[in-house]
């Protein structure tokens, strides 16, 4: 599912909302999650999961084509840990 499909599903299930309003709401949610992660904060959605950022330290990598050693810089990467209810639902629990 892509963002536009999510917007369409929410709009269909909530006919009292205008499509434009649903687009704005979904966009605002993603913007807030992104902003929180960019500030180094954790975003927890109970039952669904938690978004956070993890540090990947600098390391020496290898170019797979040439075999040459390459220095890979330190970076921050997004991380998602599923919540208990989501894991249970995915595994046929509910």
Swiss-Prot record:
Keywords: DNA recombination, DNA-binding, Transcription, Transcription regulation, Translation regulation. GO terms for biological process: DNA recombination; regulation of DNA-templated transcription; regulation of translation. GO terms for molecular function: DNA binding; structural constituent of chromatin. It comes from Mesorhizobium japonicum (strain LMG 29417 / CECT 9101 / MAFF 303099). Pfam families: Bac_DNA_binding. InterPro entries: Hist_DNA-bd, Histone-like_DNA-bd_CS, IHF-like_DNA-bd_dom_sf, IHF_beta. Belongs to the bacterial histone-like protein family. This protein is one of the two subunits of integration host factor, a specific DNA-binding protein that functions in genetic recombination as well as in transcriptional and translational control. One of its GO terms (cellular component) is chromosome. SMART domains: BHL (SM00411). Gene3D superfamilies: IHF-like DNA-binding proteins. Disulfide bonds: none annotated. Heterodimer of an alpha and a beta chain. This is Integration host factor subunit beta. CDD domains: IHF_B.
């Amino acid at each position: 599912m892509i963002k536009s499909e999510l917007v369409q599903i929410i709009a269909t299930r909530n006919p009292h909302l205008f499509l434009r309003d649903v687009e704005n709401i979904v966009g605002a949610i993603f913007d807030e999650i992104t902003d929180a992660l960019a500030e180094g904060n954790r975003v927890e959605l109970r039952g669904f999961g938690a978004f956070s950022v993890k540090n990947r330290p600098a390391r020496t990598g290898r170019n797979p084509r040439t075999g040459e050693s390459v220095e890979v810089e330190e970076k921050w990467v997004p991380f998602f840990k599923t919540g208990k209810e989501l894991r249970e639902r995915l595994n046929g629990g509910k």
